């Protein structure tokens, strides 16, 4: 059940993924909200990220690069064509204009589509 929250591997960021409606159904639009916070759990200002969604066969169905969450949050409207479990990857690429560098600050969520 949403929201889901993960900490990146280095622990520099917390990423939350929320969605409405809470039950995702194929063919209907779902609003996903990405929240990025720093290690103290304050909103990360000017956070850039990539949002990648893959189906159960690891085929990329959505690939949104360089998304800007100016106040640490941003929403995306997405419609899934088929039911199944999708993997939502969120890769933080920069915060306050400072690149995250060689380290991949990424989280993954498993999300069911009915």
Task: Give, region by region, the residue ranges found by the protein language model.
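N-terminal soluble domains immediately following signal/targeting peptides that reside
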Residues: 1-114
């Amino acid at each position: 059940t949403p929201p889901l929250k993960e900490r990146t591997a280095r622990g520099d960021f917390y990423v939350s993924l929320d969605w409405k409606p809470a039950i995702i159904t194929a063919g209907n639009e779902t609003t996903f909200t990405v929240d990025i916070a720093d290690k103290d759990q304050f909103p990360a200002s000017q956070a850039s990220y990539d949002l990648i969604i893959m189906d159960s066969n690891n085929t990329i169905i959505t690939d949104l690069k360089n998304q800007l969450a100016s106040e640490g949050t941003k929403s995306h409207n997405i419609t899934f064509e088929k039911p199944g479990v999708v993997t939502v990857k969120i890769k933080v690429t920069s915060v306050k204009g400072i690149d995250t560098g060689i380290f991949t600050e990424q989280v993954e969520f498993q999300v069911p589509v009915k």
